A protein has these predicted regions:
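FIC/Doc superfamily catalytic core
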Residues: 1-246
């Protein structure tokens, strides 16, 4: 049994991975937001039970991220996931409730800045045109859903469409498109945070120059997930690695 270099595993297995590892995905996303919850605490919250030892805001953040994943999985199961503005806004409302104060329920209504980089996101007045441009670029990649998904994540993070929760929303949208196309979902782990932020900040400042570096990082995280599910990556050629199941 083999999968191509895009991480194709089929829709059913891709969705099963997201369902089975939902607590892990929620935990990873929360950790990247500097949430101090442990994995057992996150798993308990995901299962619907309250835990002690966390602040109200940390507990709420975990619950919000979990609701975002629940909504995505349900949309995928019912075949209603789409890359559009309405879906994106709905996911952002779920993951950023009580955190987004710059136009909650829509695109942000004020300028924002990003720490650690000299890059300045587009003004809020240009966000609709930026979104339309992103959709057009995604449509050009219909035949390459992996690249399409990675571009969606990168540009949603770079444009900062929302007042908060941008990367969380982008991760949901990226994974929705991956899973919908039968590709293995991606989670970004805290252990690789420095590599992630270095690659992402490079993309912020010079997308064309750092696109390969950032996309390769995301592909490596996908390969890590594939290996976790028993897939072995064999470099048959430099341009077309083949992934096989043990």
């Amino acid at each position: 049994m083999t999968a191509d270099s895009n991480g194709y595993v089929g829709f059913d297995l891709a969705l099963f991975i997201a369902e089975k590892l939902r607590a892990q995905f929620v935990f990873d996303m929360a950790q990247m937001e500097e949430n101090t919850a442990t994995y057992p605490q996150v798993e308990t919250i995901v299962c619907g039970t309250s835990v002690a030892g966390l602040s109200v805001s940390e507990t709420r953040q975990i619950d919000n991220i979990n609701r975002g994943w629940q909504a995505l999985i349900e949309d995928l199961r019912l075949k209603r996931f789409q890359i559009n503005k309405l879906v994106t806004i709905e996911y952002n409302k779920l993951v950023s409730e009580s955190e987004n104060r710059l136009g909650f329920g829509g695109f942000r209504n004020a300028p924002v800045a990003i720490g650690g980089t000299s890059y300045t996101p587009p003004t809020h007045l240009d966000l609709n045109s930026c979104w339309d441009e992103l959709i057009a670029r995604c449509q050009e990649l219909e035949d390459n859903p992996l690249e399409q998904s990675l571009l969606l994540y990168a540009e949603m993070a770079r444009n900062q469409f929302f007042g908060d929760g941008n990367k969380r929303t982008a991760l949901l949208m990226m994974n929705g498109n991956l899973i919908q196309n039968g590709l293995c979902p991606i989670t970004i782990t805290k252990s690789r945070e420095v590599e992630y932020r270095t690659a992402l900040n490079g993309y912020y400042e010079s997308p064309e120059q750092h696109r390969i570096q950032f996309f390769d990082f995301l592909k490596q995280e996908q390969q890590t997930m594939l290996k976790r599910w028993g897939y072995e990556i064999q470099d048959v050629s430099k341009s077309a690695p083949v992934i096989t199941v043990k």
